Amino acid sequence: MLTEGREHRQSFLVGSKVSASRCHAIGVQALLAMVTILWLARTAPAAVQAPVLAAIEDSKGAEIFSGLCAACHENVTSRAPSPILLGIMAPNGIVRALTEGVMRGQGQALSAEDKIHVAQFLTKRRIDDGTDRLAPPACSPSDREFAYERVPVFSGWGITPGNTHHVPDAIAGLTKDNVSKLHLKWAVGFSGTIRIRSQPAVGGGSIFVGTQDGILYSLNLETGCARWQFPADSEIRTGIVISPWSKGDRSAKPLLYFADETNVYALDAASGKEVWRRKPNDHPRTLLTAAPVLYKDTLFIGLSSAEEMGSSLQYECCTFRGGVIAYAARSGKELWRSFTVDPPKIQGKNAVGTNKWAPSGAAVWSAPAIDVDRKQLYIGTGDNYSRPSTATSDSIIAMDLKDGKIKWVYQATKDDVWNTGCLWGQRELCPEPEGPDFDFGAAPVLARADSGADIVVGAQKSGYVYGINPDTGQLIWKTKVGRGGTTGGIEFALASAHNSVFVGVVDFDDGKQSPEPLRPGLYSLDLLTGKYNWKRPDSWETCRGRRLCIPGIYAALTVTSQMVIAGNTDGWLRIHDAATGELLWHYDMTEPVTTVGGGEASGGAMGGPTAAVPLDGKLIVPTGYGMAQYAPGNVVLVFDTK
């Protein structure tokens, strides 16, 4: 893609294309110092800048970080946020991550005081500075009222039950004729955080969105003021789902469904009051990343985990099992649960005498797709963490809606057993032989051609896209789109409309040798054959002069009948012609904007399972992905054509 008017400035790591292995040869500390100098020399987004306070030094925190944390967070091939990105966070956000969030497994080795020291060392701020979050301004009484006449029009995160992410033109209100009229209407920023992974829901005149610091906001759709806010226990990274009601029915009690890292919640959509919460799995490394899926009176949630993220020889690896749990949506009563692997058994001992367990893994990273006609759901699974491997890892699986029984399995990659011990070179923790880590991160799509034919589409980190028969699980076609890899291929970007499949590829260089070139970009395939309709590859040129910039598409896509809407990892929001791939409109999400609270903020890359949401001529965009080497940000942008 083009540089799109940006001035020409070389970006270290990006412009020079330093390989991961070369980065290690340079030395991680020296590399981070160079990145820090170059990064801070440029204007950082105001939304993610820490308040100007007297910096503090915490030597005890430095010692703890060096001993327990640096190996991952100072590894340039890791997805773990670098110390630079962690330094932007609010100190209480780091403490929460170590206590209740994704790092709670590592945090078990730390006392409450130790966690505070680590947070203060990284942020150079005291835990009690009182500057952790700047909430959007509260609505006036007239703007706070829930609008029962404005019913939700999307079924959930996947927009349709089949996860097509297809918004009809009449609902989107956005076409090739008016897309050039898009202009920023308002923006909300959330200080002290560095990413937004929660795809918003819209209903009742509100935008509902979750934040990294665990707050669910109800924002007035027209003004951006906060109607209410709800504190969850940890980061909200899932999409938000709202139950339907009849237009104008003020007796209705619509509920919101979402998950933080370990709990599923149901809230009253009008007031934000908690109706129920459930902890779906007692495994200590459980991590909820898939948006809940609401179908009729049942709520489905996939189970993923952080168990593959590395541990020690003293940890009994591995025992987590991926799966799906079904709840009665109004009460939270569990209806059934179905696992992707059998219960683990002891498989011997490791070098220090710790029990080894298997099978494990086959996590469900993204939302299930619902097949109304066949009364089944489809999930994608990840790799196994320990040997022996199973026939359900790296698979698309069909389950019966009524009881979760597995109806068929299509396994795309056999014998993929992997954990981050392989990434760090910890051979005693890495399964032998080492698998390629080719998860299905993108949610499966049940796509319907204009002829009426149904195909289940799966997209994998291997770079392959698959067309599968929904009745039998038999492969119809497969197409290699990206090079793939541990951090590459297709992560979340998969959508379909009419006879086309749209795929976003990130293809980040993970340091592994490959004869294939990286192929980040946007691609369109024929739904029935898998053949290319068009290709829109990205270029490294788009990153010249941009800090923490990597070309490609990591986040989920949204499509209309005419257009493909893609938030890119280089910080640009782009809208393409669905028929040709031609660029119709673009916006630099890293540019500073004035928020409804009066402050200055900006976004960054887009990543994870979030996507832009078009509705009634508006476009709602959560932006910022402070992970690994992606640009941080924490802003919701709302554009309008009117």
Regions found by a protein language model. Name each.
Residues 279-282, 337-358, 407-435, 480-485, ...:
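Surface-exposed loop and turn segments in beta-propeller and other repeat-based domains
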Residues 220-223, 268-271, 328-331, 401-403, ...:
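Short loop/turn segments that connect beta-strands within beta-propeller blades
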Residues 138-184, 340, 345:
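Blade/loop signatures of beta-propeller domains
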Residues 151-159, 193-215, 234-264, 287-316, ...:
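Repeat-blade elements of multi-bladed beta-propeller folds
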Residues 171-192, 350-352, 539:
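A short helix->beta-strand "capping" segment at the edge of beta-propeller domains
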